[in-house]
């Protein structure tokens, strides 16, 4: 594919207020460092073998992200069904379960060595979620031994998924009320037992795995880890986050930059708790709306949310984000199934923006629908700027905003790639492009001629226009 350098795109639209963003010449002192592979994928436990063996786009789209990031994106294998799964050493297949409909997730399942062989075939970092809810620690230790022997690129093991949802009727609770304190005691006890089963292995657990910000938090669990001398088992703390659900789905609110800023801010104290122990904080499972609620998850707008959410999260110290891919054929927020889906464009653009980055800083105040991020290389020089107009556009007259950038180090021109679509509500790929290109459904590779916009710079100053529900990645 050849690169086409085009004039700055001039769009007939309704123009709104103008903004000015100044690009700092260096990143802020004490800013969070960016992980080389911040964009990851979480795959529902029972469905993982089919993602690898029956969906060619899994490897293709992971390879597309690798091409941009320079390393394979990390994957996490887990979810609700990890706490329904037991290891069976005699099982010849990867998994065994029955469901009434292919759209359903199983209520119970078993997995064998073949499952972990498939996980071990992935050359990037892998996190594996194992069962704690059923209170069979010996079975989990047996599974962990197979994980250790088969998964060469193992990052961590999770012991249970979203334990804040455990109930007193679950085996792990022994008929008692399940509280954050009970869970913390259970987590450290299981960490000790599994470590002993793995010859006193250290730094192997991704702890927490919560979906709650009240009492089931990294702060509270970290305190218990310190109290019991268990921090040596922990490699990272993680949380899960879905900002919306079927009962409150609203695409305009989902993509709103100010709402995204507020949502990520709720995790700042948990990031700090992990950092105080020199450990990473991970968003171990996340996506736009639980169970793809309300029809918003398959849209281009969800891709815009992914883009801004990744930028905001990495800036705030969340090292990696794992976007969940659920039941094949019944997954509204999935990035691919038999074809590439609209949200993948947001993930890809975030990977473009953060590739090789060491730090980022926010140029806006975080209280409006207009966002700006400056991205810095390893030497502390600004190399890219991401601008985002989160005004919601579905139909009718499309508004735009003028943004003036100052402090640009280039003397004459810079180039840019525009992420755009016919509307925030677009599903599939119709009308979506990044730099004028779209992803091939069979290859997950960009197709068509690249359209790089050229932006004039005068005395370190440039002006760009961005329509509602668009983003612009500028290369300095």
Q: Which residues make up each language-model segment?
A:
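Fungal secretory targeting signals
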Residues: 1-22
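N-terminal catalytic cores of secreted or lumenal carbohydrate-active enzymes
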Residues: 19-203, 207, 215-223
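Conserved, mostly hydrophobic/aromatic
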Residues: 41, 75, 157, 162, ...
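Conserved beta-strand positions
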Residues: 43, 77, 128, 159, ...
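Noncatalytic carbohydrate-binding groove/subsite architecture in carbohydrate-active enzymes
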Residues: 143-146, 176-301, 306-309, 316
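Aromatic/acidic polysaccharide-binding cleft in carbohydrate-active enzymes
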Residues: 287-374, 378-381
């Amino acid at each position: 594919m050849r690169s086409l350098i085009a004039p700055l795109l001039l769009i007939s639209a309704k123009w709104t207020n103008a903004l000015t963003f100044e690009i700092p010449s260096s990143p802020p002192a004490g800013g969070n460092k960016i992980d080389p592979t911040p964009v990851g994928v979480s795959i529902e436990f029972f469905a993982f073998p089919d993602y690898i063996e029956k969906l060619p786009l899994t490897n293709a789209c992971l390879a597309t992200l690798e091409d941009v990031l320079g390393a394979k994106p990390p994957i996490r294998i887990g979810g609700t069904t990890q706490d329904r799964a037991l290891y069976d050493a005699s099982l010849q297949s990867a998994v065994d379960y029955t469901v009434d409909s292919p759209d359903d997730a199983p209520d119970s399942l078993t997995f064998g060595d073949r499952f972990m062989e498939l996980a071990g075939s992935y050359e990037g970092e892998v996190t594996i979620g194992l069962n704690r809810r059923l209170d069979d620690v010996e079975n989990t230790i047996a599974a962990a031994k197979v994980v250790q022997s088969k998964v060469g690129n193992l990052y961590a093991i999770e012991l249970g998924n979203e334990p804040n949802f455990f109930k007193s009727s679950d085996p792990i609770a022994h008929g008692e009320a399940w509280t954050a304190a009970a869970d913390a005691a259970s987590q450290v006890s299981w960490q000790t037992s599994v470590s002993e089963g793995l010859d006193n292995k250290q730094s192997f657990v991704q702890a927490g795995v919560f979906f709650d910000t009240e009492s089931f938090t990294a702060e509270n669990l970290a305190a218990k880890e310190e109290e019991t001398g268990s921090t040596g088992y922990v490699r990272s703390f993680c949380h899960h986050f879905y900002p919306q659900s079927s009962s409150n789905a609203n695409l305009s609110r989902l993509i709103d930059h100010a709402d995204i800023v507020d949502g990520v801010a709720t995790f700042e104290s948990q990031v700090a708790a992990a950092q105080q122990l020199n450990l990473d904080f991970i968003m171990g499972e996340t996506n736009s709306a639980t169970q793809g609620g309300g029809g918003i998850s398959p849209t281009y707008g969800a891709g815009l949310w992914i883009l801004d959410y990744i930028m905001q999260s990495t800036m705030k110290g969340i090292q990696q984000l794992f976007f969940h891919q659920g039941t094949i054929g019944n997954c509204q927020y999935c990035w691919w199934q038999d074809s590439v889906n609209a949200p993948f464009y947001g993930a890809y653009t975030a990977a473009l923006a953060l590739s090789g980055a060491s730090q980022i800083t926010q140029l806006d105040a975080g209280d409006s629908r207009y966002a700006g991020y400056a991205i810095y290389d390893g030497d502390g020089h600004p190399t890219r700027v991401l601008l985002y107009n989160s005004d919601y556009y579905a139909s009718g007259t499309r508004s735009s905003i003028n943004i003036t950038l100052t402090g640009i180090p280039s003397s004459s021109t810079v180039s840019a790639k525009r992420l755009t679509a016919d509307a925030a509500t677009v599903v599939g790929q119709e009308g979506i492009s990044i730099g004028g290109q779209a992803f091939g459904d069979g290859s997950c590779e960009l197709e068509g001629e690249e359209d790089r916009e050229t932006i004039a710079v005068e005395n370190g100053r440039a002006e760009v226009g961005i329509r509602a529900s668009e983003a612009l990645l500028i290369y300095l």
